[in-house]
């Protein structure tokens, strides 16, 4: 398939705010894609490169050849070029990578160059996130969307699922092919996510099931982990399905000692002090990211688990939470997250207050009769924090003045628009320490795309957790809302911009 066809569809998707129209355009493209190209096409319309990292930075895209007159690039050749770039290492690799990029862009038309720039920078912004692409795969294959989503949950990726569904002779064969994707110990599953509520009472009201007892978990201030155990072999994955097994030997040893031969557990890992209180999140995040043996030895991470997806040959994804917790208690023992089972909101509120006093983030209120809805913000999990917080994306940043002179300080905050792009909600420099100012100055200069007299404009990649006292109507920002007394809590390097809170979530919090 020509890259020009993908670029044309990307433009069509960007040109409409209608989710149905976006879905139809992508489905039409997928129907036309040859089987060998489907995985590449799916990645490109979702705004991603299959290689994830190619070594090309934004500055590499500033001085490239002009566009070609006629389209000639095949998506398979483009994918092979990016794969070759990703494999380059050692002396001379930067020069070789730049030469390969120049050759690729010289063969691309203006429309194709725009697509390639968006893929390399992660800034395609046409509103075709993975969930929409999965729905388009379902349309193209003529199968129910839940079948596709379930297969992608187990596969941990959209590409193989799309290829299997679209290669089938018809809808019945496609459903059969999709049913072949099952939970496999050793292969990461997309994690279930929680919706939000402003308080415990509201969380109870949102859950299905009426007066049935719920499970109230302490929400730990750590990093999300998913562990897979097959005998003595243990693998540890992050929220984004990155394999960090080699960086966390202490977690591997803890899981290896659990009394089960095969396990898939969902949980959190965090560093704790001598009194058992969580250390600052940035320390936990830095520890999980380091490959430095001395740093790793100086601070250990402790795993705590809140769900069990598989135990000794028994898949539990479709089992109700109460059954999964029974198995979890039997296999994970002291590594189980503290929880309360109750139908009394007042008791849950007391539990929430105690968790916050102990330095934790809050609680997650869970319906006990629901399955594990991997890859989705399921209706069965509702998180509650002691303050209003949002995970937003930094869109630009201003140079500081006074004590903050010389540092990039005042950050512009945006919520994700499901239709594409970001909606600005305000600015803040509140809550920033000197250490944070120094770190973000270096980080944001790496993300710079342009600048004017006052601000440095960024690739929208850095997620930041913001606390605020409320939301107010505002004509100053395009979303019609602004944050009141916004302040920085921490940078969330464990989250991508695609996982940031949406403008719809913000409007719900504002009561709109």
From Swiss-Prot:
Q: What molecular function does GO assign, one term? A: DNA binding
Q: Which SUPFAM superfamilies match?
A: ATP-dependent DNA ligase DNA-binding domain, DNA ligase/mRNA capping enzyme, catalytic domain, Nucleic acid-binding proteins
Q: What highest taxon heads this organism's lineage? A: Bacteria
Q: Which reaction does it catalyse?
A: ATP + (deoxyribonucleotide)n-3'-hydroxyl + 5'-phospho-(deoxyribonucleotide)m = (deoxyribonucleotide)n+m + AMP + diphosphate
Q: Does the keyword Metal-binding apply?
A: yes
Cofactor(s) named in the record? Mg(2+)
Q: Which GO terms describe its biological process?
A: cell division; DNA biosynthetic process; DNA recombination; DNA repair; DNA replication
Which residues does the record give as ATP binding sites?
217, 224, 239, 268, 306, 377, 383
Key word Metal-binding present: yes
Write down the InterPro entries for this protein, in alphabetical order.
Answer: ATP-dep_DNA_ligase, DNA_ligae_ATP-dep_bac/arc, DNA_ligase_ATP-dep, DNA_ligase_ATP-dep_C, DNA_ligase_ATP-dep_cent, DNA_ligase_ATP-dep_CS, DNA_ligase_N_sf, NA-bd_OB-fold
Indicate the residues that form the catalytic site: 219 (n6-amp-lysine intermediate)
Residues crossing the lipid bilayer are none
Q: List the EC numbers from the record.
A: 6.5.1.1
Keywords (A to Z) from UniProt = ATP-binding, Cell cycle, Cell division, DNA damage, DNA recombination, DNA repair, DNA replication, Ligase, Magnesium, Metal-binding, Nucleotide-binding
Cited PANTHER family: DNA LIGASE 1/3 FAMILY MEMBER, DNA LIGASE-RELATED
Regarding protein family, the annotation reads:
Belongs to the ATP-dependent DNA ligase family.
This chain's function reads:
DNA ligase that seals nicks in double-stranded DNA during DNA replication, DNA recombination and DNA repair.
Q: What is this protein called?
A: Probable DNA ligase
Species for this entry: Beutenbergia cavernae (strain ATCC BAA-8 / DSM 12333 / CCUG 43141 / JCM 11478 / NBRC 16432 / NCIMB 13614 / HKI 0122)
Query: Which gene specifies this protein's sequence?
Result: lig
